[in-house]
Amino acid sequence: MGIPSISPYKMPGIENLPENKVDWKIEPNRAVLLIHDMQKYFLNAYDENQSPIIELKQNIKLLKEECKKRGIPVVYSAQPGNQSPKDRALLTDFWGVGLEDKPEYTDIIEEISPDEGDMVLTKWRYSAFKRTELLEYLQSQGRDQLIICGVYAHIGCLLSACDAFMQDIQPFFVADAVADFSSEFHAMSLNYVSSRCGMTTTASKIVEELKRKEGVAN
């Protein structure tokens, strides 16, 4: 039990985006970037020298840099090691005991590790909102848009998008900055978000929109 080995697959691009039901636009003063569970434990299942991990790392790094330039807060979620049976609860039935409390498992990968001032949430369930301060933080900052990237697309990323929607927060699900167990699961998450709870987009489209807003402001 645990995370299976994941075969390489092609990272979807703009040509693979499903049709969105909404046409929301990113506003720098409303948005927060969520970097979801980019811990070594979860990425060890991939071949780091092949897709989709190559693009995943590049695009999350790009999003983080561009958000930082514009004062958009960056929030990380990370699961703790050595979770007690009580804390882990039903997750154990599906995934086993989880990650050990060792840096080679719990640490966020170096390429996108948190900077001083970034928020790191201790995450206990699929959704980054469950048993964390994420909602309170968004509300305290007056922000109601969430840019979602990380792993895994059809599990925590998708459930976080659904939870955001149910809290009246607009989710922007970055198709080429999430990764999954397979191209089929990846596509399923994009189709669900676009038709039920948010906007699917790409890293380049997010950056383009941010630059456009910047140009208008200037």
Regions found by a protein language model. Give the residues of each.
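Active-site-adjacent betaalpha module
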Residues: 1-32, 62-70, 95-218
